[in-house]
Design a protein with these regions (language model features):
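Membrane interfacial helix-start motif at the N-side
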Residues: 53-90
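Hydrophobic residues in alpha-helical segments
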Residues: 11, 83-84, 138
Length: 194
């Protein structure tokens, strides 16, 4: 025989409520979770402890209808921030662009003002787009995890693949520094090889 979920009293067959405590026979279903709330919950799992910061930035971007916003961490850490947040393709692209530009400067003896202007433009491009790129990366990663992970492991996998990776940040920052060091010597190497 069935018992009340709240007080444990035996229920009569077909009873809608418990005779002892008066609660409905079945507990009320949990309120439905909106797709938007579930999406934000998964973004919070992916981003980690800094989620409130990014949620505010993304909400402001959405409210203002803008695709760009300022990211101080990206401004100061540049390629290191891209690596820390897992934006590896963008980090490699930025390193390659900076490498080519630095090498071209050496070959053509470009004035330092041009070099400085290029550095400012590249830095602003990364800094202003970092929040948008990170959200796109998070959403793409979450979708890929949902498509491939076993149903009971999705949340754990989202949390594992998200967050920050300081080793990747340091590694990409060092790769960037080494690439610029190498690019600085390309003109000298070319002159020696002639």
């Amino acid at each position: 025989m069935a018992t009340c979920w709240k007080c444990g009293t035996e229920l009569e067959a077909g009873a809608q409520t418990c005779n002892a405590c008066g609660v409905p026979v079945a507990p009320p279903p949990p309120p439905p979770v909106s797709p938007q709330a579930e999406h934000e919950r998964k973004l919070a799992l992916f981003v980690g402890e800094k989620y409130p910061v990014y949620a505010r930035k993304w909400a402001r971007m959405r409210e203002k209808g803008r695709a760009i916003s300022w990211n101080w961490a990206a401004a100061f850490l540049f390629v290191g921030w891209l690596g820390y947040r897992g934006l590896y393709p963008i980090a490699y692209f930025v390193i390659a662009i900076d490498f080519v530009e630095f090498a071209i400067e050496g070959f053509f003896d470009t004035p330092s003002a041009v070099s400085g202007l290029f550095a400012v433009v590249l830095g602003l491009a990364v800094t202003l787009n970092a929040n948008r790129w990170y959200r796109q990366h998070a959403e793409t990663s979450i979708a890929a995890i949902e498509a491939s992970a076993a149903p009971g492991t999705v949340d754990a996998e989202i949390a594992r693949q998200g967050g920050g990776n300081w080793k990747a940040g340091v590694g990409l920052f060092l790769l960037w520094a080494v690439s610029l060091f190498v690019a600085a010597f390309i003109p000298e190497l070319a002159a020696v090889m002639r």
